Amino acid sequence: MANRRTDADQIKALVERCTRDVADGLLPSCQLAIGLDGEIILDQTIGDAQSTTRYCFFSATKPFVAAVIWQLVSEGLVSLEDPISSFIDEFKENGKQNITLKQVMLHTSGFPHAPMGPKVWSNSSTRRARMAEWTLNWEPGTKYEYHPTSAHWVLAEVITEVTGNGHADEVHQRITSPLGIPRILGLDSGEQEGIADLSLCEGEATPDELEAVFGVREMPPSEVNDETIIRFNDVDTRTVGVPGGGGYGRAADLAQFYQALLHNQNNLWDPSLLKQATGEVHNHLNDPMGVPANRGLGVVLAGDDGLSNRRGLGRTCSPKAFGHNGVGGQIAFCDPHSGLSFAYTTNGLDRHQIRQPRRGTSIASLAATCVI
């Protein structure tokens, strides 16, 4: 990995930091990858896994879906200000008729925990029927709360409506295949060999620990719980291609995707729209913990307010760094200032609400300093 722009000592420190959690028995395995100048310069697997092992990306999947939407905007098939109901008629029910595509991408659309679930998510008609039932928690555009899965089911249905193809196929045909990345979404049973099964790591934070760090004695309720997380081990869940979190692949695939975003590889995106999506903040609203969202159109930007670590990007990246992490410690970002992209994946889902984000901050902070 000889490259005059890399810092060998920092790379060594990064690998040692990632190795420590596996050696200490906190995680069963992990992968990490660094991209630079359009290539993968570090591809490391640690623990009970192979270099070919694939991991669940969880919400690090979301930018792949957004990347399709960017193309559709450039092609004139959709507009960011289009109401979702103009594509999905059923969506207009219960006061949702004016919610725009942009609001859905920014997580300000007002249905953060609207249910979908295995009983209805396998085909378009049942998904649309479920969307008709969804109700609003607030007036769209007035508040920000992360939508773990609901928003991207809507984006997936828009993709299907305007292309005539399933969202998982469109992600592969438009994004991953042109980049030489294996299919990540909608994997048939015969395509699932070599995926690391997820396991829960014991040891939740106590109420006193939570209060000392976050100022609350319990974390806000979320649909992302142990049961829903472990469901991503199921063959059927892997097959359906959950658009907000059901991508599977290697850390190197994630790092390569972000290199493609940095360099607009193969001219996959309109340059001005790519800049608008990944380089501009469109959502400044605070999250429920009081941290400004700093969201672009499908990614999170680090920002210059000293809160980049609260957004999952560590403490040492530039304000223009952007990415999107996934539950359980998945990390994926790039930094236009240095040209680095970084990804970290693990199948050990640390349930400790303080240890896990601190691990992420430590790893991301080290990674961002590996390129001089």
Go through each PLM region and give its residues.
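Catalytic loop of the DD-peptidase/beta-lactamase superfamily, centered on the K-T-G motif
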Residues: A2-T45, C56, T61, K143, ...
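Flexible glycine/proline-enriched surface loops and loop-helix/loop-strand junctions
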Residues: Q50-S51, T135-G141, A151-W153, D234-P243
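Active-site helix/loop module of the DD-peptidase/beta-lactamase fold
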Residues: S51, S59-A60, F64, L72-M116, ...
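Short amphipathic alpha-helical face segments that pack within enzyme cores
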Residues: P63-V68, S150-E157, A252-Q256
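Short, conserved alpha-helical segments within structured domains
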Residues: I84, Q97, H147-A151, L273, ...
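A glycine-rich, coil/turn loop motif that links secondary-structure elements
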Residues: E90-N98, K143-P148, G247
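Recognition helices and adjacent regulatory flanks at domain boundaries
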Residues: P118-W121, A129-E133, N137-E139, Y144-Y146, ...
